[in-house]
Amino acid sequence: MKVENYTRVKLLTDSYLQDGVGIGSIGYVIKICPSEKYEVEFSDKNGVAIAQIVVGPDEIVIEEKSNK
């Protein structure tokens, strides 16, 4: 999986429910951290940030925008 800054990703875990995001939440990579970690920002439908968390590569998958 090739993840770069501004890559759209989907969260695969409920480990961050306390931060307001769970499985299926969509976010964008804003920083690539050491040890294959990624800082991801999740926002609501109005673009207001909900959470900014550091996740591992096994906790996200690249999410292509749907045409819906």
Where are the language model's segments positioned?
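Basic/aromatic-rich interaction segments and small domains that mediate binding to polyanionic partners
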Residues: V3-K68
